């Protein structure tokens, strides 16, 4: 079964298109846009995105590494990106998980609800597979290299994470199951651990 579900890079244009829009809307603070690509968006998420958008210039060099999801038309996506902070020269490489599925209207959307036990187990298992572990390690190494090359990067990231964590501390315990929740909250290596622990 695992051989039939190997990690594929940029294999589905429709997934790449959805993920690109998701990150474009997020960096722009466009909550209406996000609502068009997510199955739901909470008030807390809207507030977090609006508060952090001034620190974020954009997400660059996005690449989607996919495994098939639990159902036809669904995908577990490990998104590699380089997060460009405003006024910081060096982008921060990161890796975030998203779960994408086809809704009743036939459109691909980003799952943003409460994950089932089955989905949690599936994501956790996938995150420990060799191909994903190698991808996580590669992204973590790139992030460490970027941080070592630009001391301002780590400082700006701390500010960004504080904004995200301040607005999500109260909901962390209830939302830790949803794999995509990390995407906008945790750039760089923070995701490496959360892919493992959270879903």
Regions found by a protein language model. Give the residues of each.
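A mature extracytoplasmic/lumenal domain signature
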Residues: 23, 38-41, 68, 79-83, ...
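Short, solvent-exposed aromatic-acidic interface loops
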Residues: 112-128
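A short, terminal or domain-edge coil/loop segment
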Residues: 87-103, 119-122, 164-170
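Short C-terminal domain-edge/linker segments immediately following a structured domain
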Residues: 67, 96, 107-114, 130-133, ...
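Extracytosolic low-complexity repeat regions of secreted or lipid-anchored proteins
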Residues: 97-103, 108-110, 120, 136, ...
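Core segments of small alpha/beta cavity-forming domains
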Residues: 1-60, 126-180, 184-188, 193-198
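Surface-exposed, charged secondary-structure patches
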Residues: 51-101
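Short, solvent-exposed secondary-structure capping/transition elements
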Residues: 31-35, 87-94, 108-112
């Amino acid at each position: 079964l695992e051989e039939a579900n190997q990690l594929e890079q940029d294999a589905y244009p429709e997934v790449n298109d959805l993920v690109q829009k998701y990150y474009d809307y997020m960096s722009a603070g466009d909550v209406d846009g996000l609502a068009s690509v997510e199955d739901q968006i909470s008030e807390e998420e809207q507030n977090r995105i609006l508060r952090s958008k001034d620190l974020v210039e954009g997400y660059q060099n996005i690449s989607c590494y996919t495994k098939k999801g639990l159902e036809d038309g669904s995908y577990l996506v490990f998104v590699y990106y380089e997060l460009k902070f405003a006024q910081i020269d060096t982008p921060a490489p990161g890796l975030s998980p998203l779960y994408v599925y086809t809704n009743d209207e036939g459109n691909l959307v980003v799952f943003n609800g409460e994950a089932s036990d089955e989905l949690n187990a599936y994501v956790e298992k996938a995150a420990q597979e060799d191909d994903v572990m190698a991808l996580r390690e590669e992204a973590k190494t790139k992030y460490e290299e970027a941080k070592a090359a630009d001391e301002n990067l780590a400082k700006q990231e701390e500010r960004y994470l504080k904004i995200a964590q301040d607005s999500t501390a109260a909901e962390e315990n209830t939302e830790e199951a949803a794999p995509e929740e990390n995407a906008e909250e945790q750039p760089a290596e923070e995701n490496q651990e959360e892919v493992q622990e959270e879903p």
